[in-house]
Amino acid sequence: MAGWPAAEAAGALVVAILAAAAGGAAGKTTIEPCAGADTCAALLGYTLYADMKVSEVAALFGADPRAVLAANALDFASPGAANRILPAGLPLRVPTRCACSDGVRKSVAVRYSARPADTLASVADVVFAGLASADQIRTANGLSAEDPDAPLDAGATLVVPLPCACFNSTDNNLPAVYLSYVVRVGDTVQSIAATHATTVTDISNVNAMGSPIVAPGDILAIPLPACASMFPNSASDYGLLVANGTYALTAGNCVQCSCGPGDLKLYCTPASLTASCSSMQCPNSNLMLGNVTAQSTSGGCNVSSCSYAGLVNGTIATSLSSGLQPTCPGPHQFPPLRATPIAVNQGSYLAPSPAPGAGEAGGDIPGFPGSSNVSPANGPSGSVSQAASVNRPHQIVALILSVALYFQM
């Protein structure tokens, strides 16, 4: 890894060959060996296989809908955010906790409920967009070596292991959060590096690549510059990391933290997304979380600020700091929030510089492209249906004509 001696970096990585598609294509995945029970913040690069609500994407990964929006610098505060529809083909970053399981880093919290016509291959390649392979899902669930295209038992709950990386949450000795990225047709290491504001050398070092060549289905660990927190170990959000140019929600959606664009210093303010939040006033002051006061003097500028110090024992902790600086700071610049996309922009994940509840797995998931995007009323939730849709006018007309011809026979 960049920032480590080259020999140690190469020894710390294991490149595994995994089945990337039912047709037998092979994809390379960077695997980080580990030991212990620690976890880290990580991101999954997911490409929508159909038009989906934000809540449906979140339910698929057991995430909070607003957290998904925040991680992509999409407006997360407006009413009805979870019900917004995202277009098929849209690449998203999904926040996850990267654990240590069976000696390697992976996200093991995702559970998927199979629907009629689901197969291991379709779940791996379509529903989870290549983040997992059919063999990995089979092994994680102790299934027999059956045909990956054989139908699964409807309603069966599957553990879906997903790739992730921690690498001490650093890159070149600077804070970083790692994105698991599935290489798509037409991608090159150069284009991937440009899209994610990193370098070919950095991607090559992190993934122990002998040459900067990738193939569709490969999964790369992409280091993203991030703002690190300095919360005490007792904080429930200890280790919070926010990728540059994005946001994260914490403290039960009471606090929003952002990173960039001017620097890589974490900046947290009240989120105002819930009515039941503990006090956010700094002790022994009139300042609230995120407030900064500045007073110019002959010797410089006296600056006082109230900062977030983590969620400790269910209470929002704050920290007051004061000091003399050479000049007074200007207004804080926040990362720009984008409107919900209605079409796919192939350029990048982010600009430069009653749906399922939050974190509730098992919500309705749209069908495959070309099939119904309406979940069957009586079908198992949280999986894919290939039932035909009759919600488009030309299909309704065809159905009416078929019925009319039937009764004329």
From Swiss-Prot:
Keyword set includes Signal: yes
Paired cysteines (S-S): C34-C100, C40-C166, C98-C164, C100-C166, C227-C259, C254-C282
Lipid anchor positions (GPI-anchor amidated alanine): A387
Domain LysM per the UniProt entry, residue ranges: 110-160, 179-222
Function recorded in the entry: Functions in innate immunity. Functions as a pattern recognition receptor (PRR), sensing bacterial peptidoglycan (PGN) and fungal chitin at the cell surface. Involved in resistance against the bacterial pathogen Xanthomonas oryzae pv. oryzae (Xoo) and the fungal pathogen Magnaporthe oryzae. Binds PGN and fungal chitin in vitro. Involved in microbe-associated molecular patterns (MAMPs) perception and participates in the activation of defense genes against the bacterial pathogen Xanthomonas oryzae pv. oryzicola (Xoc) or the fungal pathogen Magnaporthe oryzae.
Quaternary structure note: Interacts with LYP4. Interacts with CERK1. Interacts with CEBIP.
Official protein name in the record: LysM domain-containing GPI-anchored protein LYP6
Source species: Oryza sativa subsp. japonica (Rice)
Lineage of source species: Eukaryota, Viridiplantae, Streptophyta, Embryophyta, Tracheophyta
